[in-house]
């Protein structure tokens, strides 16, 4: 099967320039292709997974994947998808972000069939007069103004700096075409204009027979019409310090039945048969959420590894059952990151007083009532003795006390 057919089945193709020509090229040889990312932050988020999952599929199929870290383009800002001018970063920020993104890319793509480059290495060598003479003459301003990425900004205004972004991205494509034997650029749907500008530049500089292609991915929307990738808490990051593997796992586990098969096709390497089986289970046994569970397992393993999957599942099972005693300190940090927390001393104290002092209970009367009724669990154990003494240093390396009030309300007490 041609990889384009596989991508089409997975719903991963928005537009292709000269599909017939690209098909023939893919059948004939190992193709060089690339995707770029500007270092606007020090971590990728799940929105970045959309083009990079496609790049990974090409890599797995034996094609030569390239990633451009946009140290040059990132210093001026891509107007794509933005309603206003980007705030320029300091070069120190850009360098820091470049290093962080490169590390993440190496983790995701490994060492085989992957080349990571920085476009500052060649863009910084072009002087102003050379830029205007060698490249400026080849770009028609009317054509540039009609590109969606620019046209959408004309009413509110766009700086010359961001206006020229598509020229720099075109230079990138030409550079990789000439020096790295790269014939295909992939990107999000909003990158179509920038990518096709690069194809035009290659044809003008190398001749109309030069093989250069564009492939874009559809904008991914959820069943409710909102954009994929955002949560109430903001972006979902690939950096475990920003979004823990447990949070990452929960994000995928909580996907809507209407979306889960689409995400399994796009964000996993499961076969058509495996996904068809899970699709049937969504229809016949939706309450088991097997498709969501498999989606969470596959995505966490891809981004964080197998051990992270085990940890996330262990935390989920412990919080669901209330059996939290077996959690490690690291797992507690992950699982309780966004739950209410208080600081306490290591001093042992009567449970009623302790619950009121921590603010978990509003009054001693309420505390006594909840304890007596069995509504309070300390580190997984139901406590109904009003004379019980809490010793914060007794478990979890003396770092935490886990309190559950009722069936689902958790609190984390951190020992000072």
Curated annotation (Swiss-Prot):
GO molecular function, one term: tyrosine-tRNA ligase activity
A cellular-component GO term for this protein: cytosol
Placement of sequence motif 'HIGH' region: 39-48
Compartment annotation: Cytoplasm
Keywords: Aminoacyl-tRNA synthetase, ATP-binding, Cytoplasm, Ligase, Nucleotide-binding, Protein biosynthesis, RNA-binding
Binding site for L-tyrosine: 34, 165, 169
GO biological-process terms attached to the record: tyrosyl-tRNA aminoacylation
Record: residues binding ATP: 230
All residue ranges annotated as the S4 RNA-binding domain in the record: 349-416
Pfam families listed in its UniProt record: SYY_C-terminal (PF22421), tRNA-synt_1b (PF00579)
Motif annotated as 'KMSKS' region, chain positions: 227-231
Chief location of this protein within or outside the cell: cytoplasm
Similarity annotation: Belongs to the class-I aminoacyl-tRNA synthetase family. TyrS type 1 subfamily.
Primary role: Catalyzes the attachment of tyrosine to tRNA(Tyr) in a two-step reaction: tyrosine is first activated by ATP to form Tyr-AMP and then transferred to the acceptor end of tRNA(Tyr).
The protein, known as: Tyrosine--tRNA ligase
Native species: Ligilactobacillus salivarius (strain UCC118) (Lactobacillus salivarius)
